[in-house]
From Swiss-Prot:
Its main location: cytoplasm. Catalyzes the condensation of the acetyl group of acetyl-CoA with 3-methyl-2-oxobutanoate (2-ketoisovalerate) to form 3-carboxy-3-hydroxy-4-methylpentanoate (2-isopropylmalate). Mn(2+) binds at D27, H215, H217, N251. GO terms for molecular function: 2-isopropylmalate synthase activity; acetyl-CoA C-acetyltransferase activity; manganese ion binding. The keyword Transcription does not apply. The gene is leuA. Its cofactor is Mn(2+). Belongs to the alpha-IPM synthase/homocitrate synthase family. LeuA type 1 subfamily. NCBIfam families: leuA_bact (TIGR00973), PRK00915.1-3 (NF002086). It comes from Rhodopirellula baltica (strain DSM 10527 / NCIMB 13988 / SH1). Pathway: Amino-acid biosynthesis; L-leucine biosynthesis; L-leucine from 3-methyl-2-oxobutanoate: step 1/4. This is 2-isopropylmalate synthase.
Length: 527
């Protein structure tokens, strides 16, 4: 492994192209609470194409009817990337995956089968010979449908070297064009994975007929480091997710991998097709869609990633930016100027700013966002980028025509007074209903009032409030998860008033209940 303290010379070293395989819609969605509905998956898939990913793993078609339909719709409508579906090494899985993928101009079937001794003995109860036989049959079945077949020996990083080489060689002979080596439980280390990839390249005689891929989990916090070590050892594809979301502790973060290879091209001698200026907008979209906030100190896309508080650092930055910044905020999609618009700004200025922030609006969306923007401008002197992002994503998240809309609300509360909230709602642009409710606080009272009007009872499973911008007049964004009749629904609301944000988020979730748009990923196995 190249562990030199000094960067190696880039002279006479060819730059390799690394494929980016994004599994946000499959492995990322397995992160607890991160499930997405069809419209949200299509929006994320479109954003991934704009970002420049090479392969989009759209889902696991046999897992549920909803997952099948998501993969089918993405395969039918999304262009500009290979669309991939996951399948176990079983005919029914593989045929179901192909049924969902067959309309895609570029389709890939990704089959997997566990190979480690612990999985063979306790999960599959199969002998090594039976594993090889099933792997070969699965790859052949997939290859009968399409030319692009990926095989993953699940838990490869805990599989004996000799047996791993045997399975990989057999899979390539059967038609696998990509061999993915998963660190399924996030157990390996950079040195170990480097040696494993080098071993496969040296010992598997037909390895040159397939692309080696890495898929690392972050249980020990080494997913990105392990993925980069695999690239250093010859991997030509990295499997990753936006913001590193995924099963348990998550997956390797796409944004960190891409910027590590870009910033240290002198070391890795690799490049990708990723447009790095789209990283922050796509990160925000996935965060908004899944309801999983990005931690402030997250590398590359966190709010503090380019913040400098130390006086020594600030002094150095003023004298020469590169003293404390190894890449520029603009390079990953942050904007130089945060303060942008005011109450006298027009539609064109709003549309232009939204585009600069990575969000293209349709005419109808622009009109809705502009109306919300003007309302906000009457409440706030200065409109920040974060305000615009919150407004746009709020409107985009409204994937169905709302049955219930907010007309008015009024809060009465005090130190020695039980909070009362009066809420007035309109249904289908016609009937107006008003209710007053009490609660442990204004937000609890607002929940009760909305439930009384709509007649829909829910259990709040998660409730989060965050400030979209700085200042005492900042927009508050509420993201909540509610349960109704055994299904989970998400809602989002933004306003300068936390009670109004809560009511809007509640209505967003209730309108999804009425429309039957649940957030339910089903059972999703993983490689």
């Amino acid at each position: 492994m190249n562990q030199s303290a000094e960067a190696p010379s880039s002279e006479n070293v060819a730059t390799r192209q690394i494929r980016i395989f994004d599994t946000t819609l499959r492995d990322g969605e397995q992160s607890p609470g991160a499930s997405m509905n069809l419209a949200e998956k299509l929006e994320v898939a479109s954003a991934l194409v704009d970002l420049g990913v090479d392969i989009i793993e759209a889902g696991f078609p046999i897992a549920s009817p909803g997952d099948f339909e998501s993969v089918r719709q993405i395969a039918t409508t999304i262009r500009g990337a290979t669309i991939c579906g996951l399948a176990r090494c079983a005919e029914k899985d593989i045929d179901r995956a192909w049924e969902a993928l067959k309309t895609a101009p570029q389709a890939r079937i990704h089959v997997f089968l566990a190979t480690s001794a612990i999985h063979r003995e306790f999960k599959l109860r199969m002998t090594p010979d039976e594993i090889v036989e099933r792997a070969v049959a699965g790859v052949r079945r997939a290859a009968s449908h399409c030319d692009d077949v990926e095989f993953s020996p699940e838990d490869a990083c805990r599989t004996e070297h000799d047996f791993l080489c045997r399975v990989v060689e057999a899979a390539i002979d059967a038609g696998a064009t990509t061999i993915n080596v998963p660190d399924t439980v996030g157990y390996t280390t950079p040195g170990e994975i480097y040696d494993r990839f080098k071993m496969l390249r040296d010992r598997v005689p037909n390895m040159d007929k397939a692309v080696l891929s890495t898929h690392c989990h972050d249980d020990l916090g080494m997913a990105v480091a392990n993925s980069l070590a695999a690239v250093d050892a010859g991997a030509g594809q990295i499997e990753c997710t936006i913001n590193g979301i995924g099963e348990r502790a998550g997956n390797a973060a796409l944004e960190e991998l891409v910027m590590a290879m870009k910033t240290r091209q002198d070391f890795y001698h690799c490049q990708t097709n990723i447009n790095s200026k789209r990283l922050v907008p796509v990160s925000r979209l996935v965060s908004k869609t899944t309801g999983i906030n990005v931690q402030r100190n997250k590398a590359i896309v966190g709010r503090n990633a380019f913040a400098h508080e130390s006086g020594i650092h600030q002094d150095g930055m003023l004298k020469e930016r590169t003293t404390y910044e190894i890449m520029s905020p603009e390079e990953v999609g942050f904007t130089k100027t945060d303060l942008v618009l005011g109450k006298h700004s027009g539609r064109a200025a709003l549309a232009d700013r939204a585009k600069q922030l990575g969000m293209t609006l349709t005419g109808e969306q622009l009109q809705e966002v502009f109306e919300a923007f003007k309302e906000l401008a009457d409440k706030k002197k200065e409109i920040y980028d974060g305000d615009i992002v919150a407004l746009v994503q709020q409107k985009i998240s409204e994937t169905v025509a709302p049955e219930w809309t907010l007309v008015d609300y009024e809060v009465t509360s005090g130190k020695n007074q039980t909070p009362n909230v009066r809420v007035t709602l309109r249904r289908d642009e016609q009937d107006i209903t008003e209710q007053v409710a009490q609660g442990d606080g204004p937000i609890d009272a607002a929940f009760w009032a909305v439930e009384k009007i709509t007649g829909i009872q829910v259990v709040c499973k998660d409730f989060r409030v965050r400030s979209a911008t700085l200042g005492r007049d900042a927009i508050g964004e509420v993201n909540l998860e509610v349960e109704h009749e055994g299904k989970t629904y998400r809602g989002t609301g933004v306003s300068t008033d936390s009670v109004e944000s809560t009511i809007l988020a509640m209505l967003n979730a209730i309108n999804r209940i009425v429309a039957g748009i649940a957030s339910d990923p089903g059972e999703l196995p993983q490689p």
